[in-house]
């Protein structure tokens, strides 16, 4: 028996459709089809669990409030008690560019609302919901807080966020590090050719904005892939490689490389795929204006692609004589060793 048939003959999704919600940075629906019967539930459930439990994120882990010794206190001139303030602090959405704990401060004088946007800026930290109300100050009231922000995964209860040498007045906070706030999936029947019993997996992912839904799904898939690798206890037999003479081409053989090998971000790669840009030779003939007219393709993706192409000595808007060549897939395989 040829062992490769165990996985090579299974149907794999040939379509991955991404539909952004009202806020593309926070909500998206991804459809994968066709899948072998039963794989929709297997993959959907696994991805959902990993999305909710295993992605790294940032959260407030403790807070100190001037004049407050514990969370059951009240603050003169502040309408909310400390317990309510701590509950509001738990919902601050944060993006952190560092693994190290950081301190952030807030100071404000009333009257008025105190919001997450009043927290002093720190270079590596970004508040994603600045309009979140933390508390309300009466006229003449003043409040000063100091927050500790850390990175982690999953849910960590407050008692585990209290340092052994915690000073008096430090209030630990329940930390929900996961940037993914909600995941749902459904499995429907679809067809592949004459087969009517294949699965169609639809996943809706919501995040707090620290990571896009598309990237969150990609990270979750990578985690599952990495965890399963230990179970693969064999090496696949190598195919015998033929060594035909490579024909002379009127262009750089590197243009035969596929764009999905460029290690682009998930968003950039999906935009190229949706625009039927398969090879680097297809890509470099596009102008910047043409790329920016591609749906969901923005300036950030454009700069990323320009930087990658520059590293190869290429740029957008190039004229490539003889492109596309005949039998391009065959040529790409024959020139793999050359790029």
From Swiss-Prot:
One cellular component (GO) term of this entry: DNA-directed RNA polymerase complex
UniProt catalytic activity: RNA(n) + a ribonucleoside 5'-triphosphate = RNA(n+1) + diphosphate
Family statement drawn from the similarity comment of this UniProt entry: Belongs to the RNA polymerase alpha chain family.
HAMAP family: RNApol_bact_RpoA
This protein's record includes keyword Transcription: yes
Region (Alpha C-terminal domain (alpha-CTD)): 251-339
SMART domains membership: RPOLD
Entry protein name: DNA-directed RNA polymerase subunit alpha
Gene Ontology MF: a single term: protein dimerization activity
Task performed by this protein: DNA-dependent RNA polymerase catalyzes the transcription of DNA into RNA using the four ribonucleoside triphosphates as substrates.
Subunit-level organization: Homodimer. The RNAP catalytic core consists of 2 alpha, 1 beta, 1 beta' and 1 omega subunit. When a sigma factor is associated with the core the holoenzyme is formed, which can initiate transcription.
């Amino acid at each position: 028996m040829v062992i490769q048939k165990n996985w090579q003959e299974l149907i794999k999704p040939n379509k991955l459709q991404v539909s952004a919600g009202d806020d593309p940075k926070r909500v998206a629906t991804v459809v994968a089809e066709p899948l072998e019967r039963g794989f929709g539930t297997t993959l959907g459930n696994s991805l959902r669990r990993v999305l909710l439990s295993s992605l790294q994120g940032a959260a407030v882990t403790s807070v100190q409030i001037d004049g407050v010794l514990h969370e059951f206190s009240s603050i003169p001139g502040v309408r909310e008690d400390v317990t309510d303030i701590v509950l509001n602090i738990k919902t601050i959405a944060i993006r952190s560019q560092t693994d190290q704990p950081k301190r952030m401060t807030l100071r404000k004088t009333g009257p008025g609302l105190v919001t997450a946007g009043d927290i002093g800026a720190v270079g590596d930290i970004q508040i994603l919901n600045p309009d979140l109300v933390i508390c309300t100050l009466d006229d003449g009231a003043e409040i000063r807080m100091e927050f500790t922000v850390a990175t982690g995964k999953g849910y960590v209860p407050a008692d585990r966020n209290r340092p052994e040498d915690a000073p008096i007045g430090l209030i630990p906070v329940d930390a929900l590090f996961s940037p993914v706030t909600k995941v749902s999936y459904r499995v429907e029947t679809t067809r592949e050719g004459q087969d009517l019993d294949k699965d169609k997996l639809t996943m809706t992912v919501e995040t707090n904005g620290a990571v896009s839904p598309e990237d969150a799904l990609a990270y979750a898939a990578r985690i599952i892939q990495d965890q399963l690798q230990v179970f693969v206890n064999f090496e696949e037999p190598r195919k015998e490689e033929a060594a035909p003479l490579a024909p002379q081409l009127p262009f750089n053989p590197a243009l035969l490389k596929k764009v999905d090998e460029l290690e682009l971000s998930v968003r950039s790669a999906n935009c190229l795929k949706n625009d039927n840009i398969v090879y680097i030779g297809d890509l470099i003939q596009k102008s910047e204006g043409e790329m920016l007219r591609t749906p969901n393709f923005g300036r950030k993706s454009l700069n990323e692609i320009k930087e990658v192409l520059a590293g190869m000595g290429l740029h957008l808007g190039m004229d490539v004589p003889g492109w596309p060549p005949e039998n391009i897939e065959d040529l790409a395989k024959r020139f793999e060793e050359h790029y």
